[in-house]
């Protein structure tokens, strides 16, 4: 066992002495040590109950004859951090989480790992850390919350609340109506109920085989979710107690190139958050897999978009997907298309393969998960755009775009920060036909690559979603919809063309040809570059300054450089 390094032999008597202080007995030194990486934090709705989940898991681990050691990571709630400088810390928190997993697991030589993530950057951070350690690992998330409901039965969620702010600003909704939405949008614990970043990533973990069947859709705080916790605990112990299984089920043996491909197939079929692209690029690097951004468009061409979930379809939420058959049903239905490549032979953590897992799955409600011959779209719900404005790529959630906006030409109106853009939108500067440009919000420029949910929600709430596009070197919340193009690389802070744009420049967007261009000649761009000096923001936070000096761009997953 890996843990023998801290518990076997006379030289480890001091180590055992310390472990005895935690309650261990002689017999415990013969058992596998299981890390339980929790992300319990009281301020996040998807995490405030995870201490109870960890207790269930630890109890089951003990019953199975192993020794659990719980430790915690930090967490940032993107919704609460939204709209102020707290959002600068969201993406950087992913790196702290990954580092904490690597640190605790390697410092204490634990044999195997269960991770309990749920929201935002916590899930990808835990995956990245687990890949570095490369021991058998099972992920079991906290689960999605129920959708809210208005008094008339209309389903709502957090995206409804953000967009309602725009309606109030435009005078189309009263503050009393906004208050009703505020009180009903998030009715229970869990990750926000739509196909936002948290649920997108929890779904993709299931698709990759590192989480058990049902992980992406079984609601939080239900008996079914608690049984999933117990199953995960039993399985990790079964693996850790068998040396052959321990070698076979190291996380890198499961989360390989085929698993990443399968994740993107599901992402396309369900129209996941654009943040999944950023995180999966980072995960692929940690897994040692070369997976270029351009490959996503090739996948998209051969995957039908068969499930629309809020924010793309505001009446459908994760609980509906669960009732309709869950992620396995989506995968099985998607695989029926002859040109869709889904690697059914790839292993899953419970044993067997993806093919074994989805063999008996079926779509129970075809109004929620569409038949393969009646998709929402013949192509996937995400696209990577290229052109002189995004030489290394930009990301758009095509599932959330009005059909009239799939090809769009508009005049640039430029803002050098998210707050400038918010002020401009609320001040009436943004008109139909504009392309809102928000720059210096990339990984380096922000620093921290803020989510632009406030501006996109204001645009949607002010009924400009089919008349205005937005491009940014920042990123978006999973709750964003509309012609919102993010992750523009290179970013302004590293000299990208987005930094050269001026008000009135003509910008051309075509999601069907994967194009993002400014209608300027190479000569004009080169002339502008002669006098261009990227802005550098005055940042007070020491961690943010360190992050800015180390982070790579969005096309590389915004991972940190190995060396300065």
Curated annotation (Swiss-Prot):
Cofactor info, note text: Binds 1 [2Fe-2S] cluster per subunit. This cluster acts as a Lewis acid cofactor.
Could you state a single Gene Ontology molecular function term?
2 iron, 2 sulfur cluster binding
Active site at which residues? 477 (proton acceptor)
Q: Does the keyword Cell inner membrane apply?
A: no
UniProt superkingdom? Bacteria
Q: Which residues bind Mg(2+)?
A: 78, 120-121, 451
Quaternary structure, from the entry: Homodimer.
Q: Per its UniProt record, what HAMAP family does this chain match?
A: IlvD
Which protein family is named in the record? Belongs to the IlvD/Edd family.
Question: What name appears for this protein in its UniProt entry?
Answer: Dihydroxy-acid dehydratase
**What high-level taxonomic lineage is stated for the organism?**
Bacteria, Pseudomonadati, Campylobacterota, Epsilonproteobacteria, Nautiliales
């Amino acid at each position: 066992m890996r843990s023998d390094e801290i518990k076997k032999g006379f030289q480890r008597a001091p180590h055992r002495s310390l472990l005895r202080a935690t309650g261990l007995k002689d017999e415990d030194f013969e058992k596998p040590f299981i890390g339980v990486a929790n992300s319990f934090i009281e301020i996040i709705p998807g995490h405030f109950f995870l201490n109870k989940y960890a207790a269930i898991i630890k109890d089951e681990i003990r019953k199975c004859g192993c020794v659990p050691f719980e430790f915690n990571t930090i967490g940032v709630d993107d919704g609460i951090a939204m709209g102020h400088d707290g959002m600068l810390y969201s993406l950087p928190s992913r790196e702290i989480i990954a580092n904490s997993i690597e640190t605790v697991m390697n410092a204490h030589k634990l044999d195997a790992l269960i991770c309990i993530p749920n929201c935002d950057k916590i899930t990808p951070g835990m995956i990245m850390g687990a890949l570095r350690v490369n021991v058998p690992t099972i992920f079991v998330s906290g689960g999605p919350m129920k959708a809210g409901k208005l008094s008339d039965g209309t389903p709502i969620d957090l995206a409804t609340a953000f967009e309602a702010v725009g309606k109030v600003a435009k005078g189309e909704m009263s503050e009393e109506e906004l208050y009703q939405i505020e009180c009903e949008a998030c009715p229970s614990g869990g990750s926000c109920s739509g196909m936002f970043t948290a649920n997108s990533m929890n779904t993709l973990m299931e698709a990759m085989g590192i989480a058990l069947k049902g992980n992406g859709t079984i609601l939080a705080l239900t008996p079914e979710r608690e049984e999933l916790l117990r199953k995960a605990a039993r399985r990790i112990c079964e693996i850790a107690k068998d040396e052959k299984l321990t070698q076979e089920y190291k996380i890198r043996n499961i989360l390989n190139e085929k698993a990443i491909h399968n994740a993107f197939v599901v992402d396309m079929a369900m129209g996941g958050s654009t943040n999944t692209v950023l995180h999966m690029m980072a995960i692929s690097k940690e897994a040692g897999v070369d997976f270029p951004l351009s490959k996503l468009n090739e996948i998209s061409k051969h995957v039908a978009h068969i499930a629309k979930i809020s924010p793309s379809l505001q009446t459908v939420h994760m609980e509906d997907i669960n009732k309709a058959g869950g992620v396995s049903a989506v995968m099985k239905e998607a695989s029926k298309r002859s040109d869709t490549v889904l690697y059914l032979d790839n292993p899953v953590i419970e044993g067997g393969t993806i093919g074994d897992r989805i063999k008996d799955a079926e779509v129970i409600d075809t109004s929620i998960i569409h038949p393969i011959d009646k998709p929402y779209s013949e192509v996937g719900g995400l696209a990577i755009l290229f052109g002189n404005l995004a030489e290394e790529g930009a990301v758009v959630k095509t599932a959330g775009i009005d059909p009239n906006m799939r090809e769009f030409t508009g005049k640039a109106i430029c803002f050098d920060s998210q707050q400038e853009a918010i002020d401009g939108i609320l001040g009436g500067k943004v008109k139909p036909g504009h392309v809102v440009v928000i720059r210096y919000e990339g990984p380096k420029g922000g620093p921290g690559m803020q989510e632009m949910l406030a501006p996109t929600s204001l645009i949607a709430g002010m009924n400009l979603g089919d008349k205005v596009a937005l491009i940014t070197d920042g990123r978006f919340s999973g709750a964003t919809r509309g012609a919102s193009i993010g992750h523009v690389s290179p970013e302004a802070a590293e000299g990208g063309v987005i930094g050269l744009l001026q008000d009135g420049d003509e910008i051309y967007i075509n999601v069907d040809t994967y194009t993002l261009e400014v209608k300027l000649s190479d000569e004009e761009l080169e002339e502008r570059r002669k006098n261009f000096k990227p802005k550098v923001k005055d940042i007070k936070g020491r961690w943010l300054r360190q992050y800015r000096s180390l982070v790579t761009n969005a096309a590389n997953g915004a991972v940190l450089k190995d060396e300065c």
